[in-house]
Design a protein with these regions (language model features):
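Hydrophobic beta-strand scaffold residues
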Residues: 37, 59, 122-124, 166, ...
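NAD(P)+-binding Rossmann beta1-loop-alpha1 motif at the extreme N-terminus of oxidoreductases
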Residues: 2-68
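Rossmann-fold dinucleotide-binding core
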Residues: 104-185
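Helical "substrate-binding/catalytic lid" subdomain
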Residues: 178-271
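Glycine- and other small-residue-rich loops at beta-strand/loop junctions that grip anionic moieties
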Residues: 19, 75, 101-102, 148, ...
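Rossmann-fold NAD(P) dinucleotide-binding segment
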Residues: 63-122
Length: 271
């Protein structure tokens, strides 16, 4: 589909931090909808540079240049870096909209919202559920950007016609982050438990009978899931810590996902 045909709304000038595997695909969907998307290319890896080129992103030298003409900043980064990215944007004097689309606890989202509000920056809470989706490879994709907070409908309108689906949850910042946390608590928390079950079975020498008891199809599914997880374990460690904080904040037990964080830390050492 030609870029002009995908977007049904006037274009918006967007700054993206950063074009990792997920961020680059978000940028690609936005550029396919006719929105100019810029990024900071200073000191970025060749792999990141290549993703940005593929997504059609416009390079900027620094944050000051990125924010100078932007109407919207989108933050897609590892959870541990979310606050630092927000501080960097606030320091530039930018006063537009800010889509916080990271896997972070609602408590951290609230702290970032307070920080940005002091600088007259308007936060929209976002959470991405699903894998990277590119306009050229979108058949059957269910990847969704969930949104909450004021101006959520404005953000959703940017992606009309895009393979990246959107869902506006409410006008309350924190709801999108909470959804991401409980979803990942199950999906990625279960993967960590699976990894440790297989590890313990191996240590006790009962891996083969476990395979028989569970069935080869189940074990094969586990192995496929773990193979795709290993390279992202360093990110998932931080995500599990955010989930533990999310649980703790409402009096639920954080220990499950603190342990999952430790499992992903071990996996990241063997990627």
């Amino acid at each position: 589909m030609p870029p002009a045909a995908m977007g049904l709304n006037p274009s918006m000038r967007i700054g993206l931090l950063h074009p990792g595997a997920m961020g680059a695909s978000v940028g690609a969907c936005l550029t396919a909808c006719g929105h100019p998307v810029s990024w900071v290319n200073h000191n970025r890896s060749p792999a990141t540079q290549a993703r940005a080129v593929r997504a059609g992103l416009r390079p900027c030298a620094d944050l000051a240049q990125l924010t100078q003409d932007a109407e919207l900043i989108i933050s897609v980064c590892p959870p541990h870096a979310a606050t630092e990215v927000a501080r960097g944007i606030a320091a530039t004097g930018y006063q537009g909209q800010y889509l916080e689309a990271n896997a972070i606890a609602p408590t951290k989202l609230a702290a970032i919202d307070a920080l940005l509000s002091e600088h007259h920056i308007h936060l929209i809470d976002g959470s991405l559920i699903g894998g990277p989706v590119w306009p050229s490879e979108s058949a059957g994709s269910q990847t969704t950007l969930h949104l909450s907070g004021p101006d959520s409908n404005t953000i959703a309108a940017l992606l009309v016609g895009s393979p990246l689906k959107t869902a506006v949850l409410s006008d309350q910042p924190g709801d999108a982050s909470a959804l991401k946390m409980v979803f990942a608590a199950f999906s990625k928390g279960s993967a960590a438990l699976t990894a440790e079950i297989l590890n313990v079975a191996e240590q006790y020498g009962v891996r083969a009978p476990l395979s028989q008891a569970l069935g080869q199809q189940t074990i094969a599914q586990w192995h496929r899931a773990l193979a795709s997880t290993a390279s992202k374990a360093w990110r998932f460690e931080g995500e599990m810590q955010e989930i533990a904080e999310t649980f703790s904040a409402v009096g639920a037990e954080p220990g499950f996902h603190q342990a999952a964080a430790a499992v992903y830390q071990k996996l990241s050492a063997h990627k």
